[in-house]
UniProtKB/Swiss-Prot annotation:
Active in protein import into the nucleus. Its major import substrate is transcription elongation factor TFIIS. It comes from Saccharomyces cerevisiae (strain ATCC 204508 / S288c). The modification Phosphoserine is found at residue 977. PANTHER family: D-IMPORTIN 7_RANBP7, IMPORTIN-7, 8, 11. This is Nonsense-mediated mRNA decay protein 5. Residues 24-104 form the Importin N-terminal domain. It is found in: Nucleus; Cytoplasm. Keywords: Cytoplasm, Nucleus, Phosphoprotein, Protein transport, Transport. GTP-bound Ran dissociates the isolated NMD5/TFIIS complex. Coiled coil: none annotated. The gene is NMD5. One of its GO terms (molecular function) is nuclear import signal receptor activity. It comes from the Eukaryota.
């Protein structure tokens, strides 16, 4: 490998000239396939004379090659330069050189170290657990012995990555870890506490801070998922806990506190040491030393030691930190505050520790929660200049990591939920007194007072559900409180207060206001906010959500009905400005509520929504095609989840609009035309996330029209094109596509019989799906649903080669599963139905094929003995009756002999009669299901059973013991007595064969009794002997059923 030439290539990748860069990348692509390339990269990175920017370029290329090529199962990068695996013969050389290179550049090129660390992580995670890097641990320990802390840092990096490999394993899966902890953790702790930390002696040294942070994270890696037995012992836990506490308590040096940029200050290694020390102690408490219904690990001795020997003293440390922070004596990063508040919240949940926290609740509320919920200068700036960020952070739409205000809200809600008897009244009293002192003249409130009001209202918004429940002692006071302290701020000069009032109103849907003035005031306030002159997005958005809450209120609805169109236009505008599914949900409810008024504007609405969807979908598609390797780190990759949810919401709204035109076929066709560009973009660009909604639209439009329009046929063509692509995911999402295909087969069957072009599309979809790798029984069930519908739709127009393929696939599956046909009921009945469907059109060919494949006997034995007596679905009963009638009518006596089915003949009359007689019951059941579904929505006066949501105040049950502990004991006792083993019975029953009341079937229009009577009459005419034979074998009860059907 020519190092000089390679060096020149890396230099040229940084050239401003695109042609030069492209040429260099081509040379690198070729060079990367030559053994020794990665070693040459490391030589360049380690060379002192190479400029920093070229070293960094080589480091990034090396890192990407390792990321995508080290593991045999590594995903391939979208960058073709990276689509090659590392030569196994080169791996030992790379591992040896990598650590030496990192040591070499640790002083001079810290940016390269950060990049190479990613490569180190990949290699260690792959090779250390599989024992392919035997000298890694001793080499790392050797580096730790070096007096040069830059060298030590590399050694600790290696150790951290070694211990990271144990992070997600249970103790029984990592027994070798216990030995490592015994051998090395005492020395590691000593090095961290007595050499590096030394009671804060070197807290002005960031390099040492990085080393201490790595030691703390090593502890985190081994204790995060499970707690090693060695670390559960007092002699191990206590010194580590003391080390963490000493770091938490040690004041930060003035040089750190002098950093004005809070974000930069928070990234200081010593600040992060405090964060991870708090995180470790919180995790130990929450996961291993608490009582919880979801607690996986039962380490009672550790729990007792933590709570009795450590928790009380540490809680004093926590309170001391909070007190100093509250009085301005101590600065805490957001992350530290987050973990402190989480720790206190966990203490609230536990009965024993609540006794320690409870007496301090008022102080915590007034001096911690209240100030944290006051908007900061940054928050106010976001309200004006970055409204989407403000909404996500302050309106409970988005749980941002390490946000102290959200942690404060979580603490507050836990207090009032779990300890409401103690906390609700003082919380309400504090809100009232603060609001009274802060309000004064509503029309002239100073900013500082407005911030206090916002904090109070945010508290109220978070606990309102506890205050307005029927059993709340404060429920009767809430109307007056809302009228006095909430609704006046609709007219506030501060937009953030208007937004908060709307937010609160959106949570008042369960209240029955006795004073009609309240609803009128809410209507006027919400509509004014929705159409506010300042066009404040947070105000408009929360107003829309409040509107959604009251949209079904009679008084509110009556007023709103006069302004339907302009309100809908405003919602559309909001949907365009705010990328979230929140507004889509409002629009969907609005369309359903005011469908009649919106009908004249249906097509215009659809066009607007489709344009909005396309704008989002194009952005999402472009982002999905970005090369992830072009981003320097994971945080740089754009998060498009909000756009995706917004797009899904818009598609759902288009379906709601469609459904509102049930009785207007011409408008429905226009709506289909308007929707087509959305379907075309989804299917042509393989946007899998929207397949289901696209097919739902087709399902609903075809159902409402009872016809397949040219637009729907074009969509089928697009599905076919999508399916033919080599990397198509149509098979994977077949259950979604079945929504459209099912109705195309039902309402387009006449066209399908004439037009082989469309039939071929559906058959190709089937073909690709049935041969997909790793098909589960559930996947095959969907495939066989499609095949039987294809058979029934085409009837005798089904091409013979198609029938042969369909039968071959399903019979092969039946034979493969022959020992589980009675247990895998859902799959097996579906597979049998493919065969039965073929019997309806070609009974003799189908039976001959079963015999040829050695499947005839097992088929009839299972069908007649196990399935037919247990059928409950209309579809199964109809299908089998039709097939049995065809067998009776179409087969000659000789056919029965050749097939060895003579013994079946005497039974056929009884079987088909009994089965047909069960159809009315099945039809009634299906009709009831449809009736129940149509009336299952919540009525206007439907209320939640508030006791259902009430977990109770644990502080009310002190005398009887903690409810959680009692429930845990109950579960334990039941488990011990073997009342349940695995929670469910693996054997399926015919109850698992659900009949969807909303999904149509080709057999829906078939009058089975009419077919029955015509078939029997025809048999009597053409073969009176067989007719008499059938009647002769009927029991008196069967004869009565038979005559009842014939006379129906």
């Amino acid at each position: 490998m020519d190092i000089t030439e390679l060096l020149q290539c890396f230099a040229c990748t940084l050239d401003h000239n695109a042609a030069v860069r492209t040429n260099a990348e081509t040379h690198l692509k070729n060079a990367s396939k030559v053994p020794g390339f990665l070693g040459a990269c490391l030589d360049i990175i380690a060379a002192d004379e190479v400029p920093e920017n070229i070293k960094l370029s080589a480091s990034l290329y090396f890192k990407n090659k390792i990321t995508y090529g080290w593991s045999a199962g590594a995903r391939q990068g979208s960058n073709e330069l990276l689509d090659s695996h590392v030569d196994p013969d080169e791996k030992p050389v790379v591992k040896d050189m990598l650590i030496k290179t990192m040591v070499s550049v640790s002083k001079t090129s810290p940016r390269c170290i950060r990049v190479l660390k990613s490569a180190l992580t990949v290699i260690i995670s792959e090779d250390y657990p599989s024992k392919k890097w035997g000298n890694l641990l001793p080499n790392s320990l050797e580096l730790l012995a070096n007096e040069d802390i830059t060298v030590t840092y590399v050694g600790l990096l290696c150790l951290a990555e070694i211990f990271r490999t144990y992070r997600w394993k249970n103790n029984d899966e990592r027994q070798d870890l216990e030995e490592l902890i015994l051998n090395y953790f005492p020395a590691l702790l000593n090095y961290g506490a007595n050499v590096l930390f030394q009671d804060g002696k070197y807290m002005n040294n960031e390099q040492i801070g990085e080393l201490v942070k790595l030691i703390i994270k090593i502890y985190k890696f081994v204790s995060y998922h499970d707690l090693p037995f060695t670390l559960q012992r007092s002699e191990s836990f206590t010194p580590w806990a003391c080390f963490f506490v000493s770091i938490i308590q040690q004041p930060l040096p003035q040089e750190v506190l002098a950093i004005s940029d809070i974000e930069v200050r928070s990234k200081n290694p010593w600040v992060k040491c405090k964060k991870w020390a708090l995180a470790n102690l919180y995790r130990l408490f929450q996961r291993y030393a608490s009582t919880s219904l979801t607690r996986k690990f039962q380490y009672d001795e550790f729990k007792q030691m933590y709570c009795e020997e450590f928790l009380t003293q540490f809680l004093q440390v926590v309170f001391d930190q909070i007190e100093k922070w509250g009085t301005g004596q101590l600065w805490l990063s957001d992350e530290c505050l987050y973990y402190i508040l989480n720790f206190v919240e966990q203490c609230v949940v536990q009965k024993t520790t609540w006794k320690l926290v409870g007496p301090h609740y008022n102080v915590i509320l007034q001096h911690v929660i209240f100030p944290l919920l006051k908007p900061t200068a940054e928050t106010l700036e976001a309200f004006d200049n970055d409204p989407q960020e403000y909404i996500n952070r302050n309106m409970d739409f988005w749980d941002v990591g390490y946000s102290p205000d959200l942690a404060a809200l979580a603490l507050l809600t836990t207090c009032v939920t779990k300890r409401g008897k103690t906390t609700l009244q003082p919380t309400l009293e504090f809100m009232v007194s603060t609001l009274q002192s802060a309000v004064g003249d509503y029309n002239n409130i100073m900013l500082d007072n407005a911030l206090q009001i916002e904090s109070c209202l945010r508290i109220f918004s978070s606990i309102i559900d506890r205050l307005i429940t029927k059993d709340s002692p404060f429920a009767s006071e809430m109307e007056k409180f809302i009228l006095t302290y909430v609704l006046p701020f609709f007219k506030s000069q501060y937009g953030f207060l208007q937004s908060r009032v709307c937010d609160i109103c959106s949570k008042l849907g369960s209240m029955d206001f006795k004073d009609p003035v309240i609803t009128s005031t809410i209507y006027e306030g919400v509509m004014n906010c929705l159409n506010n002159s300042s066009n404040s997005l947070p105000v408009e958005l929360t107003a829309a959500l409040a509107l959604q809450t009251f949209i079904s209120d009679d008084q509110f609805n009556m007023k709103l009905s006069e302004h339907v169109v302009p309100t809908m236009q405003k919602l559309l505008s909001l949907s365009n400005d705010f990328e979230s599914d929140v507004i889509s949900g409002v629009m969907q409810d609005f369309v359903e509520q005011f469908a009649e008024q919106l009908q004249p504007f249906g097509v215009e609405l659809m066009n607007t929504l489709v344009q909005q969807f396309l704008k989002l979908a194009i952005d999402l598609h472009e982002t999905s095609n970005l090369d992830p390797d072009s981003f320097t780190n994971v945080d740089s990759i754009p998060d498009e989840s909000d756009k995706q949810m917004a797009a899904l919401g818009i598609l759902s709204t288009t379906i709601s609009i469609l459904l509102s035109f049930e009785n207007s076929p011409e408008i429905l066709k226009n709506l289909e035309q308007s929707f087509y560009p959305a379907a075309e973009f989804i299917l042509k660009n393989d946007i899998e996330d929207f397949y289901r909604e696209c097919c739902e639209f087709v399902e609903n439009s075809t159902f409402l029209l009872r016809d397949i329009t040219p637009i729907s046929w074009k969509i089928l063509e697009l599905i076919g094109e999508c399916n033919r692509k080599p990397d198509s995911m149509v098979s994977y999402y077949l259950s979604d596509f079945m929504l459209a295909l099912n109705n195309i087969l039902i309402y387009g069957r006449n066209e399908l019989k004439k037009n082989e072009f469309y039939t071929k599309i559906i058959f190709e979809i089937y073909q690709k799906a049935v041969t997909a790798e790793d098909n589960s029984l559930d996947d095959l069930r969907v495939v066989f649903d499609l095949s039987q519908e294809l058979v029934l739709a085409l009837d005798d127009s089904l091409p013979q080669q198609y029938r042969e393929r369909l039968l071959a696939d399903v019979v092969g599956s039946i034979l493969t599963q022959k020992n589980e046909l009675k247990t895998n009921v859902v799959f097996s009945v579906t597979a049998f139905n493919v065969v039965i469907s073929n019997m309806i059109t070609e009974p003799l060919i189908t039976l001959q094929y079963l015999k040829q494949q050695g499947c005839l006997e097992i088929f009839f034995q299972t069908w007649i003995t196990d399935y037919i007596p247990n059928y409950k679905r209309c579809y199964d009963i109809k299908l089998s009756v039709l097939a049995l009638l065809k067998i009776i009518l179409k087969l000659e006596s000789n056919d029965y002999s050749v097939l060895n089915l003579e013994n079946l003949v005497p039974q056929l009359g009884s079987i088909v009669t009994q089965l047909a007689s069960r159809l009315p019951t099945a039809l009634r059941q299906l009709a009831n299901q449809r009736k129940e579904f149509s009336s299952s929505g919540f009525e206007e006066d439907t209320k939640w059973d508030e006791n259902f949501l009430d977990v109770g105040d644990d502080d009310e049950n002190d005398d009887e013991g903690d409810l959680t502990e009692k429930y845990l004991e109950l579960i334990k006792n039941r488990a011990d007595s073997l009342d349940f083993v695995d929670g469910y019975d693996a054997k399926e029953t015919f109850d698992d064969l659900e009949e969807d009341p909303l999904t149509g079937s080709i057999l829906d229009t078939v009058d089975v009794y009419k077919v029955f009577k015509e078939s029997i009459a025809n048999l009597q005419h053409v073969d009176s002997n067989r007719y008499q034979g059938i009647l002769r074998h009927l029991t008196p009860a069967d004869q009565e059923l038979f005559m009842g059907i014939m006379n129906a």
